[in-house]
Amino acid sequence: MGFFFSVQSLRLHHKLPPNTEFLILDNNPESDHGRQIKHLAKSIPEMRVVDVVDRTSSFIKYDAFHLAKGDVILGLDCHVLLAPGFIDNLMEYWSWNPNSKNMVSGPLLYDNMVSTSDLMRPVWNGHDFGVWGDDKGAVAKGDPYEVPMQGMGCFSFIRKNAPKISDKFSGFGGEEWYMAEKTRQNGGVVVCLPQLKWNHRFDWPKRTFPLVLHDKIVNYYVAFLDLYGDLMHPACVEMTQYWNAQVPTDDLGNAIREAMTRLGLPFVG
C-alpha cells in the first residue's frame, strides 16, 4: 500500500506549503487498498479521497487538473518518495514562474540512490515509446533545462495552465510522450529541475489493473490521434509501421478501430 508511505513521508520529511491538500484519486475503491485509504484519510484532515469508477486507467491522475483546489499540482504515483529539499525547490521554481505553462519534473532516482534518469528519449523500444536516458552534465549544473519527455510518476503544473487531457484512455501505457506533447501544444515545455529527485517503486507483484498489450496499443493510438488528428501524420505512420512488426495485422487493426471509435473518428479498414 505505497500511498501510505508516500503521504506520510511528505508530512514527516518535507516543509509543505500552507493549505496543502492531499487529493487521492482511487481507481479501485472497493478493494482492500481502497478501504485502507479511506481509513487513513480519517486521521489526516487535509486528505480528500475521490473515487474514480467511470474508467480504470493510469490516466485518472490527470483528473486532478479539475478536482484539485490548490494553485500548484504535484502529481505522484502512489509508490513514489521524494528526495530532501524537493518541495522547497519546486515551490521556489513556481514562485519565479507563476504563469508558466511548463510541466516540471526531475531525475528519477534508482534504488541504489546513485543512478538517475533525468529524461526519456522519444524512440520506440519493446512495447513503449520512450527510453530512459541520463544527461549527467545537465544534472550536475543544477539549472532547470528542457527535456523531450519524462516518466509520469512525478510531475507538476500550475493548475490553471495544465493542458486538457482526453478521457478516452483505458488501462496502462502511452502517457509520457502524450503529456509532453500536450504541454508543448499548450505553449509550455517539459522542464527537468535537477533538485527534484524522486524514487519510484517498480517491482511490485500486485496491480490495480492488468497490463494488457491491446490496451497499451489502443492508448497509443488514442494519444497520437488526439495529438495529431490523422493516421497519416508522420508520427502515426511511424507508429503503425512499428506495431505492424510487433503484433498480427488483425490485432493491430482492431486496436486502431477501437481507438478511433473512442475518439469518434471514422475508421476505414
Model-found features: residue ranges?
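Conserved donor NDP-sugar-binding/catalytic core segment of glycosyltransferases
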Residues: 81, 85-127
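Terminal low-complexity segments of carbohydrate-biosynthetic enzymes
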Residues: 148-152, 210-269
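Short, acidic, metal-binding catalytic loop of nucleotide-sugar glycosyltransferases
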Residues: 7-19
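Glycine-rich, basic loop-to-helix element that forms the pyrophosphate-binding segment
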Residues: 52-68
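A short, conserved alpha-helix in the catalytic core of glycosyltransferases
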Residues: 89-91, 153-155, 161-164, 170-196
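A recurrent flexible, glycine/aromatic-enriched loop bordering the glycosyltransferase active site
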Residues: 134-156, 215
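A conserved acidic beta->alpha catalytic loop
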Residues: 23-37
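Short aromatic/hydrophobic "clamp" motif used to bind/position activated sugar donors
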Residues: 73
